[in-house]
């Protein structure tokens, strides 16, 4: 399963939910909306 908003993630292995327009923040290391 992919990671939801605000979940901890690894920028080099981005598992955030692309279908929800989420990306792993390089700076904060959590999934945020790619606006």
Curated annotation (Swiss-Prot):
Localization of this protein: Secreted
Function: Potently inhibits Nav1.7/SCN9A (IC(50)=98.1 nM), and moderately inhibits Nav1.2/SCN2A (IC(50)=216.3 nM), Nav1.6/SCN8A (IC(50)=313.6 nM), and Nav1.3/SCN3A (IC(50)=491.3 nM). Hyperpolarizes the slow inactivation, but does not alter the voltage-dependent activation or fast inactivation of Nav1.7/SCN9A. Binds with Nav1.7/SCN9A at the extracellular S3-S4 linker of domain II (site 4). In vivo, exhibits dose-dependent analgesic efficacy by reducing pain responses in rodent models of formalin-induced paw licking, hot plate test, and acetic acid-induced writhing.
Other facts: Negative results: has no effect on Nav1.4/SCN4A, Nav1.5/SCN5A, Nav1.8/SCN10A, and Nav1.9/SCN11A (IC(50)>10 uM).
Major location (coarse): secreted
Disulphide-bonded residues: 2-17, 9-24, 16-31
Organism this protein belongs to: Cyriopagopus albostriatus (Cambodian tiger tarantula)
Signal peptide bounds: none
Key words, A-Z: Disulfide bond, Ion channel impairing toxin, Knottin, Neurotoxin, Secreted, Toxin, Voltage-gated sodium channel impairing toxin
Tissue: Expressed by the venom gland.
Protein name: Mu-theraphotoxin-Ca2a
Keyword Flavoprotein attached: no
Free-text comment on this protein's domains from its UniProt entry: The presence of a 'disulfide through disulfide knot' structurally defines this protein as a knottin.
Family to which this protein belongs: Belongs to the neurotoxin 10 (Hwtx-1) family. 10 (haplotoxin-1) subfamily.
């Amino acid at each position: 399963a992919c990671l939801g908003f605000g979940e901890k993630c690894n920028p080099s292995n981005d598992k955030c939910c692309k279908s929800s327009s989420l990306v792993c923040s390089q700076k904060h290391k959590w999934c945020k909306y790619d606006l």
